[in-house]
Amino acid sequence: MNIYALSSGRGPSGIAIVRISGSETLKICQNLTKSKDIKSNEVNFCKFYDPNNGNVIDPEALLLWFPGPNSYTGEDLAELQIHGSNAVINALLRVLSCLLYTSDAADEMRR
């Protein structure tokens, strides 16, 4: 099962962090960025898009991709660092809610 959660505080803030964990993480990130060239264990500067309509969610974001088992959860893990406005946070969470199970804080710890 793939999960996601807002790992930082709720906006508004300078930056918000969303984590995704599970076997489909890379594929989800490729859909969000419209890129197959996501480098592992490096900071990827990218744009995040809504895969349903192609609208830009965040034009200047960071993506960190950690393949399992060498990640915090032991599974494939991505950390999405986005602008911390409520509009950007809500847009990304809305897209992810259509694709993934929403985790609570304990889900990542249990993994």
What annotation goes with each model-predicted range?
Residues 1-103:
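A glycine-rich (often HGG/GG-containing) alpha/beta subdomain
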Residues 101-111:
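Single conserved hydrophobic/aromatic residue that forms the stacking wall/gate
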